[in-house]
């Protein structure tokens, strides 16, 4: 979900799929 969380800058924490 990197793209979805990328906006919230949580790509590092929630970058699973």
From Swiss-Prot:
Top-level taxon in the UniProt lineage: Eukaryota
Tissue localization of expression: Expressed by the venom gland.
Described function: Shows moderate insect toxicity coupled with mild effect on mice.
Protein name: Toxin Plt
Compartments it resides in: Secreted
Keywords for the protein's UniProt record, in alphabetical order: Secreted, Toxin
Major site of localization recorded for this protein: secreted
Keyword set includes Transmembrane: no
Coiled-coil annotated spans: none
GO cellular component: extracellular region
Keyword Secreted: yes
Entry's Gene Ontology molecular function annotations: toxin activity
